Amino acid sequence: MINELPLETYLEAVVPSEMPSGYQKEALKAQAVCARTYAWKQMQEGRLSKYGADVDDSVNYQVYQNIAPQQATSEAVRETEGKILCQNGKPVQAYYFSTSSGVTSTDEIWGAEEPAPYLKSVDCGFDSEEPWSRWETEILWETLERRAQEIQGASGKLLGVSVSRINQSGAVTGLQVNTENGDFLVETEYDIRQFLSPKGSMITEKDGTQVQGSELLPSAYFDISAKPGNSVVLTGGGYGHGVGMSQTGADRMAEQGYTCQEILEYFFKDIEILQTGG
């Protein structure tokens, strides 16, 4: 089903779907600019044009839950109406994610040979006290052995799992998996988080809260301690892919008096906020 509506109306549902409406106003405005930029760029690229659509309503693009607009987020959308992030007059990929591990990454985490010129890796201590800034989970050895068979088609017993490569910001970009019938490498942020999915396990957050694991490891920022034949313990930090703006970081920055523009300039490199034609 295709739902056709004005971009600004769409954003009034996207922003509260992506960021809690209780966050600070300047953080909400930064989120609105990022969300508008992201949608604007997808519209330009026309990836879903064959379906008569500009974006879908999933995390593949931006979460659009068709919920009732919230006053705070709607105000953030209206106060930034038409504003997008650009570099050299062209809209950028304004990525954002939930919580940092203390540093952000570039798109090299997805295999880019050179980072996009508007993305940079920055220290981010603003969200260091957030529950997801540090976490730990334990995955049974037999679970990973089964996953190696299902995802990679590997056969035989699992012998070892280890980090083989990290990027400049410390994210794991290569995971070496050894089996009795051969070895293989898991690469890129998403595939690594999927292979090490903590589904069926508990995750302990920094504040001691325990939550059920999901389809993806919280982030690719982790250390691994293997107990062959028993389990692997993953100790990491952050929630999400880690590229672009940290949403909880933006909220804490706003609490400290940073403006929307200052927040965006912190997370992105050599950008300007421009007004679209409508």
Annotate each PLM feature:
Residues 1-278:
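Conserved, single-site charged/polar hotspot
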